[in-house]
Amino acid sequence: MANEQHVELIKQGSEAWNQWREQNPGESIDLSEADLRGLALAKANLKGADLKKAKLQFSNLAGASMEGANLEAARLQEANLQGAQLENAVVKNCNFMEANLQNTNFQNADIQGSQFNEDVLFGQTNLKGANLLDASGLSVMQIQTSLVDKDTKLPEYLSDDMEDEDFLNSMI
């Protein structure tokens, strides 16, 4: 369960939150299972935070720093994650339906089992080294507009389309 002090602080917005983080750099952040729906958290420092099962629907997380964070089973429907940094983050079993993931950095992130749909916005989304096994709802078009490499693990239903060597070379 979330630390109530952390929940109250983050509800004050990114500026207050980031100022508190600067003053408390060693604090372990627990926002697990917190209801953070619709919050304006653009550029929030959530590095290494525990956001497991957090409700983040409709939240603005554009440009947020979430490197190494645990967002397992978080609800991110219609969230704005444009330009967010999720490098090495755990985002397994998340719901990304209708989210904005343009320019989001998922490099080396664990995205297994997450749910997407055709309304998820991709574009220059960094999926290099990301594990997308068992993710559902992704399209070839979404992957084509993203950055992938030989270490990107795609769901099996996309793997057949991606096996074409010319296609893969055009992606790398």
Predicted regions and their residues:
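Tandem repeat scaffolds
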Residues: 5-8, 15-16, 20-172
